[in-house]
A protein has these predicted regions:
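N-terminal core-binding DNA-recognition domain of tyrosine recombinases/integrases
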Residues: 35-53, 62-148, 182
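C-terminal secondary-structure termini that scaffold catalytic or DNA-interacting sites
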Residues: 1-3, 372-380
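Short, basic (Lys/Arg/His-rich) helix/loop patches that form interaction surfaces
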Residues: 295-344
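Active-site/catalytic core of tyrosine-dependent DNA strand-transfer enzymes
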Residues: 248-308, 322-325
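Short, charged phosphate-coordinating catalytic segments
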Residues: 125-129, 198-225
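Short, polar N-cap/turn motifs at the start of nucleic acid-interacting alpha helices
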Residues: 216-218, 307, 330-358, 363, ...
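Conserved tyrosine-mediated DNA breakage-rejoining catalytic core shared by Y-recombinases
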Residues: 210-254
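Basic, Lys/Arg- and aromatic-enriched nucleic-acid-binding interface segment
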Residues: 173-205, 338
Length: 380
């Protein structure tokens, strides 16, 4: 069966180190050249896919498809829409080997990213046609309407791949603070601190994993009355769009304590490693703590606590709480635009992504306000 691996920093095309580039190998450990050529195009050429996390997402989708082709005796370059439809239908009726739960429709559509590979192969004359067709469909109202919808001349219709399934985006769910406490009670000091960073700043797990020790500001001469929050610029973000987060001073102080105590012990356990020395959060054996590991730690704690939640739900909790707070602030600062402010804080490119939190507030305002009051003491 095919194997998926990733390059290290020793991989230096054109003299530049490129760790994290996917590499697909066959059972004899030979390069599967069409797939590897596409991965190199994504990583080195295409300007909109500059993130290793994006490369991994595409690679894992193609890897799953390649294994399906091998298991069924399908030639990757001879499949038609019937085979791709069968692959989709298997996910619609089956469960994930990883989670044991049914596949979310968004996951199924994400797996169909493999079709971008076929489009690329057609452009380079590797195959004659893509194994799917496109058709016009009416765009659903699951997403909040764009602020520029009055300029849309499409009549509410888009051309889409006919193999993708209808997906209604669910409302984000804020975690009640009681559930968060139960989860945190199952965690060690470092992991509780990471949860606090997510709750109090809205940072994603990859952004927390990407925090560097040098980014942690000194607070010796700072008073909480003067500067209750400290801005920190994030460089390792989704879509490589730098933004600011605003952790409270007390959180910075607790993180400093972790650096001097638990992190110092972990660092002594590591071999000399510049990545470990620069990363803020480390594993017990002194390696940088990765985003996937952060998510797994939280999921395992949720299971032990009997809570249904994901690490990303912490970001939803922050977003809903912050929007409720900003809306209250407009009574004192009328010129404040809560949605645009929240969009900037969260780093959303599309305002409609932020607007979904308005609907969340309408359905779960009490829980969100309680969470905000407990976290910040900001609400009366």
């Amino acid at each position: 069966m095919a194997e998926l691996v990733f390059s290290t920093s020793s991989f230096c095309p054109f003299g530049l180190a490129n760790p994290g580039v996917p590499i697909l190998l066959d059972a004899q450990m030979r390069l599967i050249e069409p797939a590897c050529a596409w991965f190199l195009h994504l990583a080195l050429v295409q300007g909109r896919t500059r993130s290793p996390a994006t490369w991994r997402t595409y690679a894992e989708a193609l890897y799953d498809w390649w294994q399906t082709c091998e298991a069924n005796g399908w030639g990757w370059d001879r499949v038609g829409y019937e085979e791709v439809a069968a692959y989709r239908n298997r996910m619609l009726s089956g469960t994930s080997d990883l989670t044991g739960r049914p596949y979310a429709r968004s996951t199924i559509n994400g797996r169909l990213r493999i079709l971008a590979f076929y489009g690329w192969c057609v452009q380079r004359d590797m195959i004659n046609a893509v194994p799917f067709t496109s058709g016009e469909v009416a765009v659903g109202r699951a997403r909040a309407p764009s602020m520029l919808r009055h300029l849309d001349a499409s009549g509410g219709r888009q051309k889409v791949n006919e193999l993708t399934v209808r997906h209604t985006r669910p409302l984000p769910r804020a975690l009640p603070i009681g559930e968060v406490r139960r989860v945190m009670a199952q965690m060690g000091a470092r992991d509780r601190l990471i949860v606090e960073w997510a709750l109090m700043t809205g940072a994603r797990r990859m952004e927390i994993a990407g925090l560097k020790l040098a980014q942690l500001p000194a607070t010796d001469c700072v008073r909480s009355e003067d500067e209750p929050v400290i801005p920190i610029r994030l460089e390792s973000t989704k879509g490589a769009k730098p933004r600011q987060i605003y952790p409270p001073l007390a959180l910075i102080d607790r993180t400093r304590a972790y650096v001097h105590e638990e992190r110092a012990i972990a660092l002594r356990s590591s071999r000399t490693n510049s990545d470990a020395e620069s990363a803020l959060f480390l594993t017990e054996d002194g390696r940088p703590l990765g985003a996937c590991r952060i998510g797994m730690i939280f999921s395992e704690a949720c299971k032990r606590a009997g809570v249904a939640g994901t690490f990303h739900a912490l970001r939803h909790t922050f977003a809903g709480a912050m929007l409720a707070f900003l809306q209250r602030q407009t009574q004192r600062v009328p010129e404040l635009n809560p949605l645009l402010t929240l969009q900037t804080i969260l780093g959303h490119s599309d305002p409609s992504t932020t607007m979904i939190y308005l609907r969340m507030l309408a359905t779960d305002l009490t829980a969100i306000e309680n969470a905000l009051g407990d976290l910040y003491g900001a609400l009366a």
